[in-house]
């Protein structure tokens, strides 16, 4: 009988659903947000797919820097595709529901891919450190095997972190509450629905955030501390400019991503503002992934030349 009740409870849980409130309390905003999100989503897919294809097709881009950049672009496509289609569906029509399983999958991938990006940005900072501070030994330091290992560490760290946090968040008692005051299943919003004390879970989340968010950020700051010292010792203005251009794109991306992530995940749940959270989530789920390709290509001569080469071949074949 006990097993029957457990099985019945599990079945009811898995077949239940959540209501994603999103912007339904501001219906005049829903159509505007739908159009904006759709445009940014298409730009994200186009821009990041372009970088992935260029990195694969142009032999000049078969370097550690572009290997990691292709990983970041693929990651951004996965990150947005894991959340944006459901968001567009809920914004477009009256149905604001998401199944429990759908919510679990969305939460898992949002946490996992966000964690991957934190670690991957640190790996890219180390690559820039090796390129600027150890130029004569760069190809020895950043050999293909190490690049593959560093990328694997980034992906495994993010998915491992989510494997701990996602189930813990989903298993919180909610006393029948189904309304998620957000437009996606995000950890702070789901923790805020709990009808029990969440201090232990918040402590666990904070500890993991130190590992997955703050530790990579510290590595980034250390790497760029060394890079800055090396750049200041370069005597020629042209050399300093080249070294700065090598790193500036990555620094802009780090600032955009980490600025929102730290605010979202390193503050106590009782100080979390849902309205601020919604707009910050919009920023790092649609704006940052869409501008990443633009930031890298505008300052990168190699990517521009590769694009011209590929487009030139395409037009010649036509």
Curated annotation (Swiss-Prot):
It comes from Homo sapiens (Human). This is Putative olfactory receptor 2W6. Disulfide bonds join 103-185. InterPro entries: GPCR_Rhodpsn, GPCR_Rhodpsn_7TM, Olfact_rcpt. GO terms for molecular function: G protein-coupled receptor activity; olfactory receptor activity. It comes from the Eukaryota. Residues 53-63, 125-145, 224-245, 299-318 are cytoplasmic. Keywords: Cell membrane, Disulfide bond, G-protein coupled receptor, Membrane, Olfaction, Receptor, Sensory transduction, Transducer, Transmembrane, Transmembrane helix. The chain crosses the membrane at residues 32-52, 64-84, 104-124, 146-166, 203-223, 246-266, 278-298.
């Amino acid at each position: 009988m006990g097993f029957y009740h457990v099985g019945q409870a599990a079945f009811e849980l898995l077949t239940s659903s959540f209501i994603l409130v999103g912007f339904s309390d501001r219906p005049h905003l829903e159509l505007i947000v739908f159009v904006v999100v759709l445009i940014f989503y298409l730009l994200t897919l186009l821009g990041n797919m372009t970088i992935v294809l260029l990195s694969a097709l142009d032999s000049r881009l078969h370097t550690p820097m572009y290997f990691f950049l292709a990983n970041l672009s693929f990651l951004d496509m996965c990150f947005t595709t894991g959340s944006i289609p459901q968001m567009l569906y809920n914004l477009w029509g009256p149905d604001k529901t998401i199944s429990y399983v759908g919510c679990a999958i969305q939460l898992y991938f949002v946490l996992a891919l966000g964690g991957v990006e934190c670690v991957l940005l640190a790996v890219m900072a180390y690559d820039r450190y090796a390129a600027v501070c150890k130029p004569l030994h760069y190809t020895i330091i950043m050999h293909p095997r190490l690049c593959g290992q560093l990328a694997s560490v980034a992906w495994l760290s993010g998915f491992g972190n989510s494997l701990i946090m996602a189930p813990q968040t989903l298993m919180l008692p909610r006393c029948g509450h189904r309304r998620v005051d957000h437009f996606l299943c995000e950890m702070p919003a789901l923790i805020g629905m709990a009808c029990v004390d969440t201090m232990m879970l918040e402590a666990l989340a904070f500890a993991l955030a130190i590992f997955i968010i703050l530790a990579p950020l510290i590595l980034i700051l250390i790497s760029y501390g060394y890079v800055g010292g090396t750049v200041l010792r370069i005597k020629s203005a042209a050399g300093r400019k080249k070294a700065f251009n090598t790193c500036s794109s990555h620094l802009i991306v780090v600032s955009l991503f980490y600025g929102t992530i730290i605010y979202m995940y390193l503050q106590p749940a009782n100080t979390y503002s849902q309205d601020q959270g919604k707009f910050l989530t919009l920023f790092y789920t649609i704006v940052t992934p869409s501008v990443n390709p633009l930031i890298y290509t505008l300052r990168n001569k190699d990517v521009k030349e590769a694009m011209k080469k590929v487009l030139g071949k395409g037009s010649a074949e036509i």
